[in-house]
Swiss-Prot record, chain B:
Species classification: Eukaryota, Metazoa, Chordata, Craniata, Vertebrata
InterPro entries listed in its UniProt record: ATP_synth_F0_asu, ATP_synth_F0_asu_AS, ATP_synth_F0_asu_bact/mt, F0_ATP_A_sf
Primary role: Subunit a, of the mitochondrial membrane ATP synthase complex (F(1)F(0) ATP synthase or Complex V) that produces ATP from ADP in the presence of a proton gradient across the membrane which is generated by electron transport complexes of the respiratory chain. ATP synthase complex consist of a soluble F(1) head domain - the catalytic core - and a membrane F(1) domain - the membrane proton channel. These two domains are linked by a central stalk rotating inside the F(1) region and a stationary peripheral stalk.
Protein name: ATP synthase F(0) complex subunit a
Subcellular location field: Mitochondrion inner membrane
Amino acid sequence: MLSRVVLSAAATAASSLKNAAFIGPGVIQATRIFHTGQPSLAPVPPLPEYGGKVRFGLIPEEFFQLLYPKTGVTGPYVLGTGLILYFLSKEIYVITSETVSGAALAVLVIYAVKKYGAVIGQFADKLSEEKIARLEEFKQSCIRYAEDGIDFEKEKQAVVQKRHYLFDVQRNNIAMAFEVAYRERLHTVYREVKNRLDYHISVQNMMRRKEQEHMINWLEKKVVQSISAQQEKETIAKCIEDLKLLAKKAQAQPVM
Amino acid sequence: MNEELSTFFYVPVGTMMLAIAFPAILLPTPNRLITNRWITIQQWLIQLIMKQLLSIHNTKGLSWSLMLITLTLFIGLTNLLGLLPYSFAPTTQLTVNLSMAIPLWTGTVVPGFRYKTKISLAHLLPQGTPMFLIPMIIIIETISLLIRPVTLAVRLTANITAGHSLIHLTGTATLTLSSIHSMTITVTFVTVILLTILELAVALIQAYVFALLISLYLHENA
């Protein structure tokens, strides 16, 4: 298990060393080369879905595959058992208090991994999923914001296309207002002119009437002056005689 | 390895350098946003611990956050790795712990005295002490202040070393009893298991406590 870590660490170290600067000894300052490698790690290769397969939690599957052609399925197990027994019997590995503490630790670790391993793995996955969900939500909200902006812009553009209706209406309104004002003023002019002409006519009429009255009064005055006293008496006697004649005629005919 | 555990001042340089450098392999640096389970859980644990540790500091104090995180991780990981059989925990050596504690403590106290002398000196006298006790209190508080790095180092050393010694001794007892009376080794083996659980807890707790105390000293002295 740790062998894979070491191998991958060595691989990344080797590749980074390949890209890193190479400073040869005894080279003058001006020819030093720095930062020749690619400065970016993108695109990062995807994480593998599952870790490498191991047996007993320690020994990678590749070891078993390595020994399979020569020794079959039981080969690695026999090798392991033999090694352990060899080390124990020859006291190459001495059983000390460390063995006991190692055994206790092994018991604890195996128990913890068996019981809580999957739970912790799921918890870690949940953390990653929450992170991805937060980022996804942010991305979606940015996209929604941009789309809302686009819709808003389109709407405003459509409104702008229909602006000419508004202008036509306003233009018609203004034309009507002009028309009304023009007619009003025309009417005012007509009225004023008519007033003036009526004034002149009424002045003329009044003058003529005054002249007539004056003439009539003058005539009457003169006629009345011209009637002498003698004429007046004769006229009155004639009138009385006419009235008597009429009274006789009236008596002769019965009143209806 | 057994001799190294039972002496405080013997300094094994070669294995110690290896033991100090090894935990770095267990803390990989992610080069992507969504990482594998190992790194995700590490990030989550670090966030959990550091939220507690760093919540009390102002902006200036937060410049210590990397130091505190590194401290917690280093002490925790070296303690845990020291529980493995045939491994070595550098935190059992007083030299390592002193060389961590003294600079860190000095770094919290000396700037405090330099820039905020009044506040730092005021910490030496708790509020509401009666007048006649003041000289005694000042002396006692000064001594307690000056002894803090030693307490930090010795606490860590003693805890880890004591745990290792207990496990070692109980293991030896198990081995010795196995030839005398085989049935009692179940008792001692269970004791070893329980001690290992305790040691696991102690390893992590001591790391946290170390960093917490440094954070508190930092907070006291601004």
